[in-house]
């Protein structure tokens, strides 16, 4: 078994009505510089989002959430941010903002398998299948 290495992660939240501070966890971003890993898991739960704000444009939110995955992957079609280093992309994605899509505080831990960790965090925090 490989020795555990440090990682950082943050939860992606959709805050349909920013003034109410209600949110739905929609994804997780995991970054490990020691393992050269940056990836995200996103799941759009339309029913939960519409329960908070029936007028929400869920398809627009879904497009913005999928951009997070493309930026993590370094997809050139995702724009200039996707061309930054993995470290720069992670910290750009996790910067605080007051918008419909927000990010939790960054948390840290140890893992020898960041992909399995990402899958587990997505199941536990977002409820992905």
Put a short name on every predicted segment:
Residues 1-129:
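Polybasic/polar functional segments that serve as interface/processing modules
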